[in-house]
């Protein structure tokens, strides 16, 4: 197999479709209401996530790719909340705000990881004049390498034929995750990505691989597509194109926690790769790998370039996890959702020695994941003196990344990791040496969050300073 990469240097993607705000209320359920036979949920946390076409844009932004999002929202609080959420991820929002309709919002109430109720706030946009949206599309589409039309059947894409023609006139490929059984409305699109049930609802039941291929190629011909990608759940996905062999990819998911938004991930990565100049085969391969990652997460989620790169090269998360703070926060949230215990430590780790190895192995045994926060070069210099560090940050983190005991690495620039620890809030904070727990940076934040703090012993005689002194003696 070719050496594929999750780095998309040239890609720019435009997304247009049904944007939504997903709200989650989490709480404990310990009793039944005296008013009616329903559980009482004591809400303890709440969360907001981008849904629909907005989740597609979030998926693209998580790949460090330039993305613009177009759609219809209301002139309301939820529209403002959605816009703010997206802008924080550097997504260029180009919405048409309506006085007549609310922003589509879905509120889910959960307890102990079980969804108890979903409340939908919406009115379809089928009676809305979309001329302003079409004008925005015509003005912007020529600046992008791919257009995704994200259809959730809410009416934003009622003029989908006009949208396809605008993009094709600008020589921009159009990818659509279809909705409903009227695929004729998508005539002339570059590629559709129906799941198996959506595909069979249009072409009829397929009992064999041959039937899928035959009916898929006929659909391509009937509605003038360039290609068709059928996503087939546990059977992977199949790419069909006229006069070419079918390209089948088996599923790569190891464990399925939630399929919410998996289709969004597929079309996001697929469009991003095509916009970056990749082939259909490589683009589908990357999309399939990304889908395998995202179904292992809880709720509507995205895939980072680190996760995708690791999966492409069959790297386990353990031992290869150099991350930005934002990527780490996402990884920790997903791990906690799976019930994993997060352990965190920090240090300079200038010259790695047996004491470090033993310490990190012991720390890792205390939980399911170990985070190592590493002082930046300037931070080490302030703490240790002008002659340090011996090894720069990049090299120090690369060496630590090779240890099986280390799950994730993150740099910090301050003298202490107190702020970072307060953001990550591990279940257990550990530090080596003769500290008292209350003296450890970040201990107050961890305790306040219900976590614990533990001091581990270092091996006697093992220190970076001792190593440096021995080297000096050899030199003399």
From Swiss-Prot:
The active site is at residue 264. It comes from the Bacteria. Pathway: Nucleotide-sugar biosynthesis; ADP-L-glycero-beta-D-manno-heptose biosynthesis; ADP-L-glycero-beta-D-manno-heptose from D-glycero-beta-D-manno-heptose 7-phosphate: step 1/4; Nucleotide-sugar biosynthesis; ADP-L-glycero-beta-D-manno-heptose biosynthesis; ADP-L-glycero-beta-D-manno-heptose from D-glycero-beta-D-manno-heptose 7-phosphate: step 3/4. Its EC number is 2.7.1.167, 2.7.7.70. One of its GO terms (cellular component) is cytosol. Keywords: ATP-binding, Carbohydrate metabolism, Kinase, Multifunctional enzyme, Nucleotide-binding, Nucleotidyltransferase, Transferase. GO terms for biological process: ADP-L-glycero-beta-D-manno-heptose biosynthetic process. It catalyses: D-glycero-beta-D-manno-heptose 7-phosphate + ATP = D-glycero-beta-D-manno-heptose 1,7-bisphosphate + ADP + H(+); D-glycero-beta-D-manno-heptose 1-phosphate + ATP + H(+) = ADP-D-glycero-beta-D-manno-heptose + diphosphate. InterPro entries: Bifunc_HldE, Cyt_trans-like, PfkB_dom, RfaE_dom_I, RfaE_dom_II, Ribokinase-like, Rossmann-like_a/b/a_fold. Residues 1-318 are annotated as: Ribokinase. Pfam families: CTP_transf_like (PF01467), PfkB (PF00294). Residues 344-476 are annotated as: Cytidylyltransferase. NCBIfam families: cyt_tran_rel (TIGR00125), PRK11316.1 (NF008454), rfaE_dom_I (TIGR02198), rfaE_dom_II (TIGR02199). PANTHER family: BIFUNCTIONAL PROTEIN HLDE (PTHR46969:SF1). Homodimer. In the N-terminal section; belongs to the carbohydrate kinase PfkB family. Catalyzes the ADP transfer from ATP to D-glycero-beta-D-manno-heptose 1-phosphate, yielding ADP-D-glycero-beta-D-manno-heptose. This is Bifunctional protein HldE. It comes from Haemophilus influenzae (strain PittEE).
């Amino acid at each position: 197999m070719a050496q594929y990469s999750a780095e998309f240097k040239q890609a720019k993607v435009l997304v247009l479709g049904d944007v939504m705000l997903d709200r989650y209320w989490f709480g404990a359920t310990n009793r039944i209401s005296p008013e009616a036979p329903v559980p009482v949920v004591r809400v303890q946390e709440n969360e907001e996530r981008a849904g629909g076409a907005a989740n597609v844009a979030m998926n693209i932004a998580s790949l460090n790719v330039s993305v613009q999002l177009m759609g219809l929202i209301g002139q309301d609080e939820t529209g403002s909340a959605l816009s703010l959420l997206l802008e924080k991820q550097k997504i260029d929002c180009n919405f048409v705000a309506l006085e007549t309709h609310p922003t589509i919002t879905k509120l889910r109430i959960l307890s102990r990881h079980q969804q108890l109720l979903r409340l939908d706030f919406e009115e379809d946009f089928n009676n809305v004049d979309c001329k302003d949206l079409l004008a925005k599309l015509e003005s912007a589409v020529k600046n992008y390498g791919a257009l995704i039309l994200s259809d959730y059947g809410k009416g934003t894409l009622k003029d989908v034929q006009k949208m396809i023609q605008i993009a094709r006139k600008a020589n921009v490929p159009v990818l659509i995750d279809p909705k409903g059984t009227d695929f004729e409305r998508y005539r002339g699109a570059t590629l559709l990505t129906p799941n198996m049930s959506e595909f069979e609802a249009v072409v009829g039941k397929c009992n064999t691989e041959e039937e899928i291929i035959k009916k898929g190629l006929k659909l391509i011909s009937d509605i003038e597509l360039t290609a068709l990608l059928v996503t087939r759940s546990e059977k992977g996905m199949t790419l069909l194109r006229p006069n070419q062999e079918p390209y089948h990819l088996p599923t790569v998911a190891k464990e399925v926690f939630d399929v919410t938004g998996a289709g969004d991930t597929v079309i996001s990565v697929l469009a991003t790769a095509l916009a970056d100049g990749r082939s259909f085969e490589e683009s589908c391969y990357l999309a399939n790998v990304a889908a395998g990652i995202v179904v292992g997460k809880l709720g509507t989620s995205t895939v980072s370039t680190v996760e995708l790169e690791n999966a492409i090269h069959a790297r386990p998360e353990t031992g290869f996890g150099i991350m930005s703070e934002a990527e780490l926060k996402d990884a920790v949230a997903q791990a906690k959702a799976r019930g994993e215990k997060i352990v965190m430590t920090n240090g300079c780790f200038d010259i790695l020695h047996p004491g470090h190895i033993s310490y990190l192995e012991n720390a890792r045994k205390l939980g399911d994941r170990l985070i190592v926060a590493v002082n930046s070069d300037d931070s080490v210099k302030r703490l240790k003196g002008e002659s340090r560090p011996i090894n720069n940050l990049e090299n120090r983190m690369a060496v630590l990344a090779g240890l099986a005991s280390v799950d994730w690495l993150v740099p910090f620039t301050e003298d202490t990791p107190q702020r970072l620890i307060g953001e990550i809030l591990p279940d257990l904070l550990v530090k080596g040496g003769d500290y008292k727990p209350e003296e450890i940076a970040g201990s107050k934040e961890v305790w306040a969050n219900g976590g614990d703090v533990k001091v581990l012993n270092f091996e006697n005689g093992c220190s970076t300073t001792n190593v440096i002194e021995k080297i000096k003696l050899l030199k003399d």
